[in-house]
Structures are given as structure tokens and as C-alpha cells.
Design a protein with these regions (language model features):
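Structured mid-domain segments that build the active-site/substrate or prosthetic-cofactor binding neighborhood
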Residues: 1-118
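Ordered core of a single globular domain
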Residues: 71-171
């Protein structure tokens, strides 16, 4: 865990790797939940810093000058690659996903045997995974302190700029 297989560097906390030939849904979910907790800490901290710097350098001074009472501050969050995560977890849960590793034991690919429900097709099985993912991650966000006690909100967008991020990280 926490290893960037494309650049071959440890980029997050080291975690015991999954060593089985096939991905086990319960094992993956347990590790994935831990990683979401770790990521929520970093994500909220970075967004807090961004909001602080906006205030420090008067990024929104003109807009805020128009508000003459207590303003409702929001804290916008999102999940890049949401549909891909849902499809990946669905494949692990409903099909068989063989983990292909290189000579050093690093995952380099996956081989899916069988079919699985995909996100966006009105299949309640995929929708259940999507609902769990969004609720779980957003609950983790809400449990953290936000700058100026702003209220977290979230959106799930499928935008093409996220493709570039995935290519850079091997996703």
C-alpha cells in the first residue's frame, strides 16, 4: 500500500500488501476504508490551507465586501475517478479479479473473469457501492475541522481533466 507503481516510489504510509492471487472484496474494502481516512486528513488540511491563503491575500475581498451579515461559508469537496472506483470495487465483489504482478511483486495489471454491474446503468448493486463510497468518504470529511467552521459540501463530476491526473499516477 501507498506505493506508486508507475514511478516506483513510496508516496503514502507503507501498508501490508495484498498477496493473494485474486482480490478479496472484504480485504480490499478494509484497506480502502483506511486509505480514505488517511486521505481525508490530507485533503481537508490542504483545502484549509487554500482557504487560509485566499483570506490572507484577499482573493475574495470584493465579493465578501458585499455581504453585510454573517455569511454561510462552504467547503467544497469532490472525488476524482468516482465511477472508476465504483466499477473496480464492483468487479472485485461480483466477478473474479486476478492481480497481475511484476517480478518484484508490484501490481501492474488486473485480469477480470466474469461480468459485473457498472456505475451509471441503474443497477442497484453498483449503486449500493457508489452510495457507500460517497457516504463513507464524505462522513470522513465532515468529521474533520474545516477552516472558519465552514460547512462541507461535495459534488461528483466526470471531467476530462481528471484523466490527466490518473495518467500521471498510474490509475
Amino acid at each position: 500500500g501507498g506505493f506508486d507503481e508507475k514511478h516506483r516510489i513510496q508516496c503514502g504510509p507503507a501498508m501490508q500488501r495484498i498477496t493473494s492471487e485474486y482480490a478479496d472484496y472484504d480485504e480490499v474494502i478494509e484497506k480502502f476504508d483506511w486509505w480514505m481516512d488517511w486521505l481525508a486528513d490530507i485533503y481537508v488540511n490542504v483545502l484549509n490551507l487554500i482557504h487560509y491563503m485566499h483570506d490572507k491575500y484577499y482573493y475574495e475581498a470584493a465579493e465578501m465586501a458585499l455581504i453585510n451579515n454573517d455569511c454561510n461559508r462552504s467547503f467544497a469537496t469532490g472525488i476524482a475517478g468516482f465511477s472508476h472506483v465504483v466499477d473496480s470495487l464492483s468487479a472485485i465483489k461480483y466477478a473474479k479479479v486476478k492481480i497481475i504482478r511484476d517480478e518484484e511483486g508490484i501490481t501492474k495489471d488486473f485480469q477480470i473473469e466474469g461480468d459485473f454491474p457498472r456505475y451509471g446503468n441503474d443497477d442497484p448493486r453498483a449503486d449500493e457501492i457508489a452510495t457507500w463510497l460517497l457516504r463513507t468518504f464524505f462522513d470522513k470529511i465532515r468529521r474533520r475541522h474545516t477552516y472558519r467552521d465552514s460547512k462541507p459540501s461535495t459534488s461528483i463530476l466526470t471531467i476530462t481533466s481528471n484523466v490527466v491526473y490518473g495518467e500521471a499516477t498510474g490509475a
